[in-house]
Amino acid sequence: SAVSNRGEKFDPAIQPTLNMYNEYFGGGMNAIVFQEMRESRGLAYSAGAFLITPSKLKYPYVYRTFIATQNDKMIDAMKAFDEIINNMPESEKAFNLAKDALITRLRTERITKSDVLWSYLNAQDLGLNTDSRKELFEKAQTMTLPEIKAFQEKWVKGRTYIYCVLGDEKDLDLKGLSQYGPIQKLTQEELFGY
């Protein structure tokens, strides 16, 4: 798992593109991350990457990635992941699948019961007074892959990360892992409190 925080604050103008980027790049089984890491390269059981929208105005955007892989494939998986994050593969077919999936989800998603209140309060926490899904739905219709690439270049490429690796130390390539920065080993008690 890796996390990157550059301190960027909430910007409603980027939200439609951010949502489409997440759908295209890091979303489900048709997303670039899953297709590249699992299907094409066989380096992961599961993988994902998302630019996470802050829940309040005072919080920053955070980029979060995860890879579930075998210990002996860890370094290769990390290198491949860094490569596709910084040099995002472009596939018009995958983009159209992502676009259709996002539009379909927006068409069928309903906010009901107590979720109406929670959605309203969450919007208020971000300084919004309308349902942001409306703008997302409208902009998604005409969004293009070059727009997603430009977003990736500005908001994702070149980030620095804090990595978290879980595994049996004797099975991990610590020398290879050290190329990503200093290694800090944590005990079970430090992680879980027992």
Residue ranges with predicted function:
Residues 1-11, 34-87, 92-145, 153, ...:
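M16 family metallopeptidases and their MPP-like homologs
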Residues 1-32, 66, 193-194:
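His/Glu-based metal-binding/catalytic segments typifying zinc-dependent metallopeptidases
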Residues 1-6, 165-194:
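An aromatic/glycine/proline-enriched structural segment found at the starts
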Residues 19, 31, 122, 134-137, ...:
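A generic, residue-level signal for flexible/boundary positions that often mark functional hotspots
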Residues 29, 73, 170-173:
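Short phosphate-engaging motifs
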